[in-house]
Swiss-Prot record:
Name of the gene this protein is made from: FNIP1
Alphabetically ordered keywords of this record: Cardiomyopathy, Cytoplasm, Disease variant, Glycoprotein, Isopeptide bond, Lysosome, Membrane, Metal-binding, Oxidation, Phosphoprotein, Ubl conjugation, Zinc
Family under the similarity heading: Belongs to the FNIP family.
Phylogenetic classification of the source organism: Eukaryota, Metazoa, Chordata, Craniata, Vertebrata
Protein name: Folliculin-interacting protein 1
Region of interest called Interaction with HSP90AA1, as start-end residue ranges on this chain: 929-1166
Post-translational modification Phosphothreonine, affected residues: 294
Length: 1166
């Protein structure tokens, strides 16, 4: 079964995906493994199927002519192609005969200046390919069909297009009407009134799901038999469904364009009905249904021509003699020959299907060139004209080959700034630092002639996808933005086409969310590659789009262990919390988890002590613990809390110092050995434990929060899925914390298991994508319970901290001294499970790191050993009265640090909290993290919940005010999963090229690639030649799902320090490609103010937030402008300056931003 759209593109690290690399490498953003693809692997074959003469091969680029030394085209060595003309008559028997009257080629005989005609044999697969193209399309069907075929042996991928050409006796009526009937949507009564049908909707939807619709006629028995999986699914097979059409007046016969949903083509689990509803004809359903009955294969194969068919051309006129109008079908096939390496084939297949709109657009351009060549050939009987027509096809083929190969092989920017921020990278602090470093460099070295402000002005004016990212919460959504992120007429399309994130991403990149719709791209020209690359990296912050994440839907009864490799099912016998009966709890955990208790002998001494700290592993020798020791554990007034994501240790105050290297070697081999209860979970970072603050409150305190913040100078480790230089702030209300019920059963009845299962996607974009690196299932929030051997049931009253994270590895160690754990009287009616507390009226309220005080420190001298993901709080002799729980009398003030994490990662701290009065809830210690700076609360901002290191603002907030203002936002952001199903997010270890956001942001390219949204080139020679034709092509054959009013290209010349904007609506004049950009004063002030903040040693994170705030100001000014212009027809620029304080230089930018939310602004100002 072929892969779907969002399946991971490359299975190996050598593929197109960005390899794992050190983000500190200044050039890491521009390293992208380049796949190999030769232009000769692309083959073009053109057929015509005439009602009288049968099927002919007009052009085949794979057939070499007899005179090998003759070159027909000047463009390359791959131009030894078959001659244009009806040279190969395909007969039903499979034989082929050469027709010498039409094929032309240049003669090498100097004496004979006239063109000679030569015949050549047809290729061996001509019959087969012809059957595949025409196979199930009846001659009566006048529409255009687009099909994709996968040939297994030899591995080939074919994209074919069949369209109708009408011919007559007169020259004017010959091929002048070479247009697809899809384009005639009842707009002209003299043109075809065929139905508006599309093919690609259903066809791509079935690729990889099942094998559909074999060709109507069997393949020729004369040729070799090949295994062919044809993905063709035609409109004649579809049932009438409610599918809206779109306005078309040009050659836009793209089935994808009509579907307005690319993702549905690749992930629909059933054949999508493909019919499009003609706007002005309500009876199209009936006509489509009749045609489906008469042409469907289920009803048998009908004769090719029948006077009974309702789609003959007898009532149409294309010339003075409509009675003798003849009809031809032209088929264009582009065949991609794949390598024998299966991995390479998979890479190209994924690239092809994920970028299909681009392939289809270039296919349409090739089709137009072939049409023009055919017209030229038919208009004249002169052999020279036919040779010229042939050369045109060769030229168009070479251009197609070059474009596709460049699109596939050119380098990309490996780590775009905005997308990397949105993906929740653990390197966010370093990312901000690098961005500000590049920003400072460019402001100091690229500001000549106001180059950088002009470029940013042009980018913000045309690439408008940044506007929704700075909108504050609570603002009404941008109508046009929402339309671009869904299908047109979404209510009707939703019946068969789901939401299309890939299409939304493509529209974002091109900035096509304004009104009128403009498609923008940016090209940086410069001979200094380093400068160009740095500028490209900087621009990826402003050219934004949505990030894509792949999810799999698990239906009822589907085994999660199959979908989640390495997971293991564990069960436990639980006593009912209401009834007395027992029930079995089945949970999942990772195979490599500590739950398996497969401790290595290397980390244990013979007496079951820890190799690192010489502390006994309780789980290994729990039987040797005396009853007296158990009582000591229960009655101890010392509390040992270990805060960890992977390793939890409880050590004595006199823990010995260990070699960090030795610890690192074995740090993944520890296993937890004792039982614990999860009560309240607080997302934390880490800080030196001696700086941790414990609140002092009464015994009946509802909640006490113990936070830790680790050293800020720790190294990052991309092999883990958390943050390295900051803490994760997870904004979740109390009702979003996943409760964990804990058992009251004895240890003998337990089996190791995981509690808590939150498979629905997290609304926090940062946290959703942090488990990428280690393929950790980030939707599982699982506290751990470990077996304790023969410990009595009253041991259940002990409380320790547990780890609640995506990973299941938790290591716990217990000191040699009697384990001094706080006790919780299980007989107390208030000591109920967190599950009960969660649903109780006076439930626990849990706060994030935003609300907990901490002090940062750089002191790391007291660390005894180093364990990844572990933070230990150990007791010392000196104590202080810090009442934490009912059963905790004292808590150590001067805690030693036994083991600290090698890097700063997201931690969860679970603390025991009994029920009590709510008065103490106001006594909670409030904290402001370093990111607590008044700023916009944009839901799309990648930095909204991020953190900084050196901002140094300790702002306090009351919990009530903290939650009160955002409770409504939380309610709106709740995602309710489908009943009986769960969404599993597939975490790609590395970003792949299968999404437009990373594949269309090009690096420094050797030649111009028209499809790239952003790219750098060294020379503008070829760029100048093809720019205007590319812009015109973008308007005529849009890759988006709607007509494009204008295509623009921002040209930044770093050699001349100029910024111009070329438009499809303006012609090149005075040797200039476009119009000079007017620098916006708002943008100039934005850049300079951000630079000044950074020069005053403010943190890079704060500077980036300031930049976001200034961008938000642009949005508010555009709102102010739109409100002022509402209801007015014309407004003078001076009036805007006096009333609104808007300068004339800012008007184009603000008008473009306003067009995203107020379309009428464009009618007044633009």
């Amino acid at each position: 079964m072929a892969p779907t759209l969002f399946q991971k593109l490359f299975s190996k690290r050598t593929g197109l995906g960005a390899p794992g690399r050190d983000a500190r490498d200044p050039d890491c953003g521009f390293s992208w493994p380049l796949p190999e693809f030769d232009p000769s692997q692309i083959r073009l074959i053109v057929y015509q199927d005439c009602e009288r003469r049968g099927r002919n091969v007009l052009f085949d680029s794979s057939v070499k002519r007899r005179n090998e030394d003759i070159s027909v085209s000047k463009l390359g060595s791959d131009a030894q192609v078959k001659v244009f003309g009806k040279c190969c008559q395909l007969k039903p028997g499979g034989d082929s005969s050469s027709s010498l009257d039409s094929s032309v080629t240049s003669s090498s005989d100097i004496k004979d200046q006239c063109l000679k005609y030569q015949g050549s044999r047809c290729s061996s697969d001509a019959n087969m390919l012809g059957e595949m193209m025409f196979g199930s399309v009846a001659m009566s069907y006048k529409g255009s069909t687009l099909k994709i075929h996968q040939i297994r042996s030899p591995p080939q991928l074919m994209l074919s297009k069949v369209f109708t050409a009408r011919t007559g006796s007169s020259i004017c009526g010959s091929l002048n009407t070479l247009q697809d009937s899809l384009e005639f949507i009842n707009q002209d009564n003299n043109t075809l009134k065929a139905d508006n049908n599309t093919v690609i909707n259903g066809l791509l939807g079935n690729i990889g799901l099942s094998q559909f619709c074999s060709p109507r006629r069997a393949f020729s028995e004369q040729g070799p038999l090949r295994l062919i999986r044809s993905a063709s699914f035609f409109a004649v097979h579809s049932n009438p469904m409610d599918m809206p059409g779109r306005e078309l007046n040009e050659d836009r016969d793209s089935g994808i364009a009509r579907s307005a949903s690319l993702s549905s083509l690749l992930i629909t689990p059933f054949p999508s009905p493909n019919s499009s509803l003609t706007r002005s004809c309500a009876s199209s359903y009936q006509r489509r249904w009749r045609r489906s009955q008469t042409t469907s294969l289920e009803n048998g194969v009908f004769p090719r021509w029948s006077i009974e068919e309702s789609f003959n051309l007898s009532d149409e006129s294309c010339g003075p003699n409509p009675g003798i109008v003849r009809k031809k079908k032209i088929a264009i096939g582009v065949i991609f020959s794949l390598s024998k390496d299966e991995d390479e084939n998979n890479k190209f297949n994924e690239f092809f299907f994920s970028h299909f709109p681009l392939f289809e657009s270039h296919m349409n351009k090739l089709k137009s060139a072939i049409e023009q060549a055919m017209k030229m050939s038919r208009r004249s009987a002169d052999a020279s004209q036919r040779s010229l027509a042939y050369n045109r096809i060769v030229d168009a083929l070479n251009e197609f080959r070059t474009t596709i190969c460049n699109l596939y092989t050119m380098p990309r920017i490996g780590e775009p700034v905005w997308l990397t921020m949105m993906s929740g990278t653990p390197e966010k602090n370093h990312l901000c630092y690098r961005f500000m470093k590049e920003f400072t460099f460019l402001m100091e070295n690229a500001s000549k002639n106001q180059f950088l402000p002009a470029l940013i002005t042009a980018v913000l004016t045309n690439h408008l996808a940044w506007v929704p990212t700075v909108m504050p919460n609570g603002q009404p959504p941008i109508k046009i933005f929402l339309e671009k992120h869904s299908s047109q007429s979404v209510d009707m399309l939703a019946k068969t086409h789901p939401y299309n994130p890939l299409w939304a991403q493509l529209g974002d990149l091109y900035g096509a969310i304004g009104s009128p719709v403009r498609l923008a791209r940016t090209v940086v020209v410069g001979k200094r590659q380093d400068m160009v690359q740095r500028l490209l990296y900087f621009l990826t912050y402003f050219i934004r789009c949505s990030e894509l994440q792949e999810t799999h839907l698990l239906e009822n009864g589907e085994d999660e262990a199959i979908v989640m490799p390495g997971t293991v099912i564990t069960t436990t016998l639980e006593k009912g919390e209401i009834e007395e009966s027992e029930y079995v709890l089945v949970t999942m955990h990772r195979n490599k988890s500590s739950l398996l208790f497969k401790e290595s002998e290397e980390i244990r001494t013979p007496n079951c002590n820890c190799k690192y700290c010489s502390h006994p592993l309780l789980g290994q020798n729990v039987e040797n613990i005396s009853q007296q020791e158990r009582e000591d554990i229960q009655n101890s007034s010392k509390e040992l809390l270990g805060i960890s994501d992977e390793c939890q240790m409880i050590s004595p105050s006199d823990c010995q110092e260990e070699n960090a290297v030795d610890v690192k070697q074995y740090r993944d081999k520890l296993r937890t050995c004792f039982d614990a209860k999860l009560e309240t979970v607080v997302c934390t970072g880490s800080v030196p434990v001696d700086k941790c603050a414990l609140s002092e409150s009464g015994l009946e305190s509802t909640e006490e929060t113990w936070q830790s913040e680790k050293l800020l100078d720790s190294d990052s480790h991309t092999g883990k899925a958390m943050r390295s230089t900051g803490m994760v702030v997870e904004k979740k209300p109390p009702d979003k914390i996943v409760p964990a019920s804990f058992s009251c059963e004895a240890a003998q009845t337990k089996v190791t298991f995981l509690i808590g299962d939150s498979m629905s996607p997290d609304s926090d974009t940062e946290l959703r994508s942090q488990a990428v690196v280690d393929q950790i299932t980030r939707h599982h929030t699982k506290p751990l319970k470990e077996e304790r051997g023969a410990i009595d049931q009253h041991q259940e009253t002990k409380q320790t901290t547990k780890d609640q994270s995506g990973e299941s590895d938790t290591q716990n160690m217990v000191s040699e001294e009697p384990c001094e754990l706080p006790c919780w009287n299980h007989s107390d009616p208030e000591s109920m499970s967190l599950f009960d507390e969660y649903f109780n009226d006076d439930s626990i309220e849990t706060r994030t790191i935003d609300d907990v005080p901490f002090k940062t420190s750089t002191d790391s001298k007291d660390h005894c050993c180093m364990l990844e993901f572990s933070k230990i709080l150990c007791t010392k002799n000196n104590k202080q009265n810090n009442e934490f729980c009912k059963c905790i009398e004292t808590v150590p003030q001067d805690s030693c640090k036994t083991c600290f994490p090698q890097q700063d990662q997201r931690d969860t701290l679970s603390i025991l909290v009994p029920h009590g009065d709510k008065e103490s809830s106001d006594k909670k210690i409030a904290v402001g993290t370093e990111w607590d700076i008044p700023r916009n609360e944009s839901s799309d901002s990648a930095l909204g919940d991020s953190e900084s290191e050196d901002t140094g603002h300790d702002m306090t907030r009351q919990v009530s005010s903290y939650y009160g203002g955002e409770q409504e936002d939380w309610a709106e952001e709740d995602e309710i999963p489908f009943p009986g199903s769960k969404l599993i997010e597939v975490s790609a270890v590395q970003p792949n090229i299968a999404n437009f956001g990373r594949s269309l942001l090009g690096g420094y390219c050797s030649s111009y690639v028209p499809d790239f949204v952003l790219q750098g080139i060294g020379s503008d020679e070829r760029f100048r030649q093809c720019l205007m034709s590319d812009l015109s092509h973008a308007v005529q054959h849009p890759v988006l799902d709607e007509p494009i009013a204008e295509a623009v290209c921002i040209i930044a010349d770093m050699d001349k320090w100029t910024v111009q904007v070329a438009s499809s609506q303006r012609r090149v004049t005075d040797n200039k490609l476009g119009k000079e950009v007017l620098v916006s004063s708002l943008v100039s002030n934005l850049l300079h103010s951000t630079l000044q903040l950074y020069k005053h040693n403010l943190s890079p994170n704060f500077c980036v937030m300031h930049l976001e705030d200034r961008l938000q100001e642009l949005y508010f000014k555009s709102k102010m402008l739109s409100e002022y212009l509402r209801g007015q027809m014309r407004v003078h620029v001076k009036e805007l300056g006096v009333v609104l304080g808007i300068e004339s230089s800012d008007l184009p930018l603000l008008a473009a931003v306003a067009s995203t939310h107020s379309p009428y602004v464009a009618q007044i100002l633009l």
